[in-house]
Regions:
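N-terminal "first-domain core" detector
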Residues: 1-45
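Beta-strand-rich solenoidal segments
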Residues: 43-46, 50-172
Length: 172
């Protein structure tokens, strides 16, 4: 019996699925380490770190990120999302007549940071330092900002909850 690309892909999918299920069921949706947020003038700085989304994906931010604040009203949330980026272009072996066609050979795990008018985790239950994982892949809230008397403020109570999720991981 010969091992095929399909066999290897099935094995990878199985192990990734098991790891995601472990993350969802045991850890929930949370910041695992780092990812502190600092507000300085018109910019937000996000520290390196790792988080788990509701699907169980591991989101790694390897270095400090600087973002400009958006033009928003009243309140807004800084969000972190898991994304997969196709890389490694190679000539496609399955093209008829078109010898210049390419396809991707690798998937790189990455992240995106964004802004949202609402908290993507607001409908989730908070229990023992984590949001209950719903199984869907959607953004994770890192910080809440409000505008008070024309000044942008970073919500300390929201930060304490995010930090509590980070601090309780593995304490159990």
């Amino acid at each position: 019996m010969m091992l095929t690309a399909q066999d290897l892909q099935a094995e990878q999918a199985y192990h990734i699925g098991k790891r995601q299920m472990h993350n969802r069921c045991l850890h929930g949706c949370r910041v695992a380490c780092g990812l502190g947020v600092t507000l300085r003038r018109k910019y937000v700085y996000i520290d390196p770190g790792m988080a788990l989304d509701c699907h169980g994906n591991e989101i790694v931010v390897p270095e400090t990120v600087k973002m400009s604040l958006p033009q928003r009203k009243r309140r807004f949330f800084l969000t972190l999302s898991y994304v997969e980026v196709e890389t490694g272009r190679v000539p496609s072996p399955f093209t008829e007549g078109d010898h210049h066609r390419e396809e991707f050979s690798r998937i790189q795990e990455a992240y995106t940071l964004g802004w949202s008018a609402r908290d993507p985790l607001s409908a989730h239950d908070w229990h023992l330092g984590a949001w209950a994982a719903c199984g869907q892949s959607h953004p994770l809230s890192l910080a809440k900002f409000t505008i008070q008397r024309g000044q942008i403020k970073l919500s300390r109570s929201f930060q304490e909850r995010v930090n509590a999720s980070r601090d309780t991981l593995g304490s159990g």
